[in-house]
């Protein structure tokens, strides 16, 4: 509630003004949302000292004395709507900044949009609410200059102390600049915090060239996580929030939903960071802003693969199964995605991808020893019959009518079990016959799939019900020798086919997150630093450099 003593002084100030020429009368009783544009082209600017109420967060300004009010009739303090509009148009035409928020700001004022931040009372607490957030951006590695904080604060000070004149500090020029910069900073901040200041799909899906000729260039898909981006409706809503005096509420609502964001900010708050640490913080905070449709924090049970860590974590409540993993090389990077593990296949056959056939197999066309050594066979797609490797040409191997398949069992490149999930890259999580990879520090060795150190333990984790009989069958199937006996080979233990299992549904499906963070906490909240194995921090920083301190 407004203080009664102060109310009396407001009325006295109004009475003083009321004694002036009718040309300069302002009606104090009207809402501050009645913008300058609704008044005559020249109105007296005096209410910059007044504050509408004393609610929490409002800025209390000194009451005008009779001497001060008398000075307000001077030309220096007159607000002229047409002059403000002209200045706004000049600012919009001179603005060359390229963010979507910037273009929305330009369009809004060039189209004659309502004044949002300034009115006959000057500039109220909404500007202070915005500045309170903008003054914290250095905690996330950003510079205040990106949001024109210095200029906004100087102009607010001029208005609130009447430090204006008829020259370069002309009140209409200052007010127009305040209006424009507040809107631009507001849209930049709210859109960036809510959706991210960068678009990961544009950045990472235009990074690695797949094919290139004189006509076109195609790129590998490296980022396939669905992220929301700001729409026209978002910007319209944001501007409406300013107009309706809901700035503070909206600023709280647009903060990142990812729990990791708050952890990163808290971990580095108040610390003196090296340049490398600052860049790492900047990049990982930005990743945590990208507005995904799903997050690990939404689930009690899930599988997380953080590529730079070279580890897979299977998490259920407070229980964590951790294992080493190997991922794609620099040329065949593991794509980032969210999915659900739906099925596990035991002793799978491997249908070799065309890219691998082209790179590694086609040179051995007509060499049956190579195919036998790798336990490959060739299948005619239309007839379903096997083709003698001795009769296969390079052209046939490259023809989609023929498959090259590796037999399941011991020695298969997929190992003894593969975990299937929907994705656009034909990748999966699997066991491997190349166990040596897990002894390496750098484990970027695959064609894009994820190889795991503890496949049986992961299989058990994924089961909805821990059925002992089923677990025994999976274990037995993963150890049974299913290969054909070779001539002269000693008699081996007979396979018990009743204990074999080929495919097991994961019910319910388990969420899978394949992500990329060079700063990431463990389940206890301790932050860990990882090498930038794919160089994604460097790529992302090129887009964030202009924002940095």
Language-model features: where?
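Generic detection of intrinsically disordered/low-complexity segments and helix-coil linkers/edges
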Residues: 4, 18, 47, 102-103, ...
